[in-house]
Structure formats: structure tokens, C-alpha cells
Amino acid sequence: MLTAKSDSTKTDYAKVTKGGKIDTGLFTVIYNNKSGKLYFELPDSAFHRQYILANRMAATSDTQDFVAGQMINTPLLIQFSKDERNVYINLIQSNNVVDKNDPIAASFDKNFLNPRMKGFKIAARNNGNVVIDVTSFFGTNEAYISPLKEVSVFSKLFGDANAIKGTFSADASSIDFVKTFPKNIEIESTLSFNTTGMIKKPYSVKVHRSLFVLPEDPMPMRYQDNRVGFFNNNKNIYSSSKDKVESKT
């Protein structure tokens, strides 16, 4: 039985790597130009770190909503987790924080669980590493990193009611390139849509996604300053020593 399992594991890994280019960096990336398939091979160490996933417009066929170089949304703070079947991307709830030594920390953790944003079936295993297919995440109109503006009641109030809307065109979309480095992975994709507004036309964008690992020893938080060009967000600070939640930026 052990031999059969080992043979099956080797066969699965051979399938995902066949014809693909294997690059090592932040973690191993397997990209097949012919099939368009993109795989991440994650070691156990990848599941103990936090990452930033940034989503930027690299080029566009219509500047109504975004121009080249503009951030599409607020960068996501994420972490990978896994079970026997799947790997998950968890969205870290960084807006709400508490000191880990505070008496309310245990209760806080139960009420601010980091939600699972996306799940990937484990496609293969290799020497303790797990391999997942991330083609659809980076090569299709994934909701959390979509280049289409989300229309809501608030967006209508701020003049975004006429944002470009469209249906995703899979046959006109592709992952263009993948580059790996020791601390980051860069992925650029062309995503195409058929607009569904008053004027129906093709709409294509090139989106650049950056996945980079954060330091194991986090930098101390500081107040937001427009003179410093780093990402910032609001913090709701919970404490048993105060009778209200303190908000800071």
C-alpha cells in the first residue's frame, strides 16, 4: 500500500510538471506556456508566514475606471493554510487588533476569525510540499482581485454607478508571464470582457499581481503619513483596559 501511494504521488507530480517551466524563489512556480497552467508548490514553511497580494493595472483599453499604474484595490493581507485535501487563502482581519497578552485575546480570536477567501484542491505532492493549480485565480475574473469596479450603494453615491460592466471572455484572456524572486512572485495577466452597458464592445486590461512575503519580525505600527508611500489602513484596537474601541490610522 505504501508503494502504491508513493507511485501515485510521483505520477501526480510528473503530470503537473510535464512541459512546464519550473522556477524557484519565494516558493516553486510551475508554468506551462502551451497549456497556460500555473501551479504553486508550497513547502510547509509557506504556511507560517503572512503575505501581501497587490493588484495593479498595467495597461487598459479604456481609461474610464482605471489608468495604467493605478492600484485596483487595497492590497490584501493573506496567509495560506491547508488540510489533507485543500490549500486555502485566508484573508487576515488586520483592521481589528488586540494585544496577544490581553485577557480578552481568546474571546477576540473567536469573534474575528480570518475567513477563507479561496480554496484550491491539492493537485500533487512532492517531498512534503503540496502543489496547487492557481490558473483560474490569476487568469480569470476572480472576484477579490477583479479589474471591474464593484458597484454598491456607496459607489453610486461617489459617482461610480457608471463603472464598466461586462462578462468575462475566457478565450480572450491569458496569463502572460510569471517571474519569481526570493521574496516575491510577479504575475501579469490579460483579462478580457464583453461590456454589457449602453455601448457593447470588447474591453481588455493587463493586470499585474505581486505576492510578497512579510518579515517574520513585523515592523512596529505607526501613524499614517502621506509623505511615506506605503500601504495603510485603519485599526480598531480592542483592550480590556478601555471602555471603548480605539480607532487609529
Residue ranges and their predicted role:
Residues 2-249:
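Auxiliary tRNA-acceptor-end handling modules of aminoacyl-tRNA synthetases
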